[in-house]
């Protein structure tokens, strides 16, 4: 898979074939941040408070909306308003993993109403190609009013110890991304997938998938449940375009100060990668 990670966000935005990825790169450049904060809190008040306080320093807020104890219209409208106020995208880390008919309903129907407010979603390809096809089909349907403002990340790798998301699974992730590139904007992975060789698909000249890397933490190397952390510099150096940090920010004594530190380190690592100062 070809990689354009040595190019600036501005250069990538100017030629990117995916409208949401283009917007994401423009946000990153405008705010000088590649930080995604994983806001793993359990009440709407906590979520909206974090989104408002950290909004100026992040490109994306990542939610696990089903862990909220009080999800309601207030959650949805509040999050959408803050995304507009602070110019960030919303990534619902739902990790869809079921047959196509089911995930279509989970995404565009149901109590969580994910398609209404989440710019970005993700899925595992363990069920096969059908899950990506189904989500892409939903997003391109005539009655889907959000169109190019929605995109999918394929969970190609994970940072947990002993992860089975390796080898052929990762290669197939690349294959499906290429086939459904109008909706698939990139991957959640531990590195650039530029060296992945496929016998099924080949890169096009304009191919430019966005890489999000989870498990970024400045002060910790892991936890007791098998999570393995990278620093902002190591993640960006391995090909991440956007770094995802959770407890290192929201559980810090001063989350705003922590977000600013991740923003600084992530941006410096990006400038070093593209040859800036």
UniProtKB/Swiss-Prot annotation:
Its EC number is 4.1.1.23. Changing residue 109 to G: In strain: CBS 120.49 / N400. It catalyses: orotidine 5'-phosphate + H(+) = UMP + CO2. InterPro entries: Aldolase_TIM, OMPdecase, OMPdecase_AS, OMPdeCOase_dom, RibuloseP-bd_barrel. Pathway: Pyrimidine metabolism; UMP biosynthesis via de novo pathway; UMP from orotate: step 2/2. The active site is at residue 95. One of its GO terms (cellular component) is cytosol. The keyword Lipid metabolism does not apply. The keyword Lyase applies. One of its GO terms (molecular function) is orotidine-5'-phosphate decarboxylase activity. Keywords: Decarboxylase, Lyase, Pyrimidine biosynthesis. SUPFAM superfamilies: Ribulose-phoshate binding barrel (SSF51366). Substrate binds at residues 40, 62-64, 93-102, 229, 247. One of its GO terms (biological process) is 'de novo' pyrimidine nucleobase biosynthetic process. PANTHER family: OROTIDINE 5'-PHOSPHATE DECARBOXYLASE (PTHR32119:SF2). Belongs to the OMP decarboxylase family. This is Orotidine 5'-phosphate decarboxylase. The lineage of its organism: Eukaryota, Fungi, Dikarya, Ascomycota, Pezizomycotina. The gene is pyrG.
């Amino acid at each position: 898979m070809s990689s354009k990670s040595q190019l600036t966000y501005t250069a990538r935005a100017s030629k990117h074939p995916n409208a949401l990825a283009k917007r994401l790169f423009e946000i990153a450049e405008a705010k000088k941040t590649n930080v995604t904060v994983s806001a793993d809190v359990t009440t709407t008040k906590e979520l909206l408070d974090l989104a408002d306080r950290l909004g100026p320093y992040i490109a994306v807020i990542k939610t696990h909306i089903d862990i909220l104890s009080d999800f309601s219209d207030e959650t949805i409208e509040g999050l959408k308003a803050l995304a507009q106020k602070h110019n960030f995208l919303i990534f619902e880390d739902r990790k869809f993993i079921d047959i196509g008919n089911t995930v279509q309903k989970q995404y565009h129907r149901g109590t969580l109403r994910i398609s209404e407010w989440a710019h970005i979603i993700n899925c595992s390809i363990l069920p096969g190609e059908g899950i990506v096809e189904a989500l892409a089909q939903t997003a391109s349907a005539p009655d889907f009013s959000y169109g190019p403002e929605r995109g999918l990340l394929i969970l190609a790798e994970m940072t947990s110890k002993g992860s089975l998301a390796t080898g052929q699974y990762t290669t197939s992730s690349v294959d499906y991304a290429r086939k459904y590139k109008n909706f698939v904007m990139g991957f959640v992975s531990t590195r650039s997938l530029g060296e992945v060789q496929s016998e099924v698909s080949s890169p096009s000249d304009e191919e430019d998938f966005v890489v999000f890397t989870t498990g970024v933490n400045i002060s910790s190397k892991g936890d007791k449940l098998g999570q393995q952390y990278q620093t902002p510099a190591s993640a960006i150096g391995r090909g991440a375009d956007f770094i995802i940090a959770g407890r290192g920010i929201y559980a810090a004594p001063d989350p705003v100060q922590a977000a600013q530190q991740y923003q600084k380190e992530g941006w410096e690592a990006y400038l070093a990668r593209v040859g800036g100062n």
